[in-house]
Amino acid sequence: MPPHPLRVAVVCSSNQNRSMEAHNILSKRGFDVRSFGTGTHVKLPGPAPDKPNIYDFKTTYEQMYNDLVRKDKELYTQNGILHMLDRNKRIKSRPERFQSCRDQFDLVITCEERVYDQVLEDLNSREQESFQPVHVINVDIQDNHEEATLGAFLICELCQCIQHTDDMENEMDELLQEFEEKSHRPFLHSVCFY
């Protein structure tokens, strides 16, 4: 088992749905967890697919919530966005961008391949300082409320298994292979260094 609790980052595009659902569940299970997005802006569904609500990462969840209540409370209640923002503001005040964070993690879990590529690109562009390894794992999760919940439990189970390995560096590939077979989902895995 690692000498300290596993430091985990969960990353999706906007730090709203998938990463926050996993953040919520991992936090309740006692993990040292943070969540992030990799997009240039935070996007939430709007009144039509081609009209998303776009916010800066500095915008708080509370401000987004109030803005959407003002725009169309019924629509955003019905589609679950207000409920999601209400959960988010109880976890932290605003979304965070992965590329702006300089904290070090043992494990970074992404929720889609495009985000995985952005995280790897960011980590590989940083100057190496501590040469501390970080495992980056992608778990593909569709961006809807139900899949976010199922994906969060899968991520939690994966983190619990990794937390209990004796030798994370040597057991990771075998562990991920077992998870792929069990969950019928492909996982991507890379190791980067801080």
Curated annotation (Swiss-Prot):
Transmembrane segments: none
Any GO MF annotation of the entry: RNA polymerase II CTD heptapeptide repeat phosphatase activity
GO annotation terms (biological process): mRNA processing; termination of RNA polymerase II transcription
Keyword Coiled coil: yes
Keyword list, A-Z: Coiled coil, Cytoplasm, Hydrolase, mRNA processing, Nucleus, Protein phosphatase
Catalytic activity as recorded in UniProt: O-phospho-L-seryl-[protein] + H2O = L-seryl-[protein] + phosphate; O-phospho-L-threonyl-[protein] + H2O = L-threonyl-[protein] + phosphate
InterPro entries linked to this entry: RNA_pol_II_suA
Locations listed in the record: Nucleus; Cytoplasm
One Pfam entry name: Ssu72
Coiled coil: 160-185
EC number of this enzyme: 3.1.3.16
Domain of life: Eukaryota
GO cellular component terms, A-Z: cytoplasm; mRNA cleavage and polyadenylation specificity factor complex
Purpose: May be involved in the C-terminal domain of RNA polymerase II dephosphorylation, RNA processing and termination.
Similarity remark: Belongs to the SSU72 phosphatase family.
Protein's name according to its UniProt entry: RNA polymerase II subunit A C-terminal domain phosphatase SSU72
Organism lineage: Eukaryota, Metazoa, Chordata, Craniata, Vertebrata
